[in-house]
Amino acid sequence: MIFSLILAAAAGTAAPAPGPVIALVAGEGASQCLPDHSLCLEVPPVEDGDASEAVLRVTSAGSAPASLPLPAFAAAETVALWPTLIRGKDEGGAPRYLVGVLSGQTSMYSGGGGSASQLHLLELRAAPGAARLGGEAIELPWDGSLMIRACFSEADMKDRMEACHDEYEYGAGLTAAASSGDAVFPTLAYRAVATAFPRTSRRSDDNSGTRLKRADLVRAEDPACSYDRVLRYDAATAHYELDQPLPDCSDYTVP
């Protein structure tokens, strides 16, 4: 996704610093594991595409796998594991994490289509042999990709220099922010980047009659939907709070 490319370019070849946001590694089959394989997770494919039947399969060292039902996510057509864990403070000696689940939707249009997903962070108490899911700490728009037909006549093709589809991309990432003090879960930094092609296109506008210039035929960031937010965990509500509300970027995040 576009955010991953931006992050990789900024990081160069430097090794990632250790911290509470842990990238999972491939385990047995389709499972994703902590680097030491002490905990492995999987969201198996659901039968008949029924996302309401999705479960989180948890395997700890020395314990039998447990299948924990996932909550129903509104409008979800697909459910997948986010390949990252966020480490919190242990509870009674048992590890505590936030596990990410991506719920997705797709739409098809005449001459185009789109997809999008949302990230749900759920509390996971991972005591060996007694794993259980808690509530949702936050839901965030995660990615979106849309292509919309914009030429309906030969005149449109000429006016748009044969760029006959508008393309919209949205990508986000989460990293650990500043020290979280005594908070149960770490403070997080959320960054979103949205782009449009051609650079003048906006999904909420009628772009079909727009006369484009050669300079418009580039992919450009939309500053209204490219932004940063800080997320702080509130133990009283068991929920993350944003430092500012999210802008309305449904042009990018709703297919």
Task: Mark where each language-model region is.
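Sec-dependent N-terminal signal peptides
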Residues: 1-11
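Generic N-terminal initiation segments characterized by hydrophobic and/or small/turn-forming residues
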Residues: 2-4, 67, 130, 137
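Acidic, small-residue rich beta-repeat scaffolds with periodic aromatic anchors
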Residues: 14-34, 124-255
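Short N-terminal edge-element motif at the start of the domain
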Residues: 40-109
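Short coil-to-beta strand junction motifs in C2/discoidin
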Residues: 49-53, 113-119, 221-226
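Solvent-exposed loop and beta-edge segments used for protein-protein assembly and interaction
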Residues: 91-95, 114, 180-184
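Contiguous hydrophobic, core-forming segments of folded domains
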Residues: 97-101, 105-125, 132
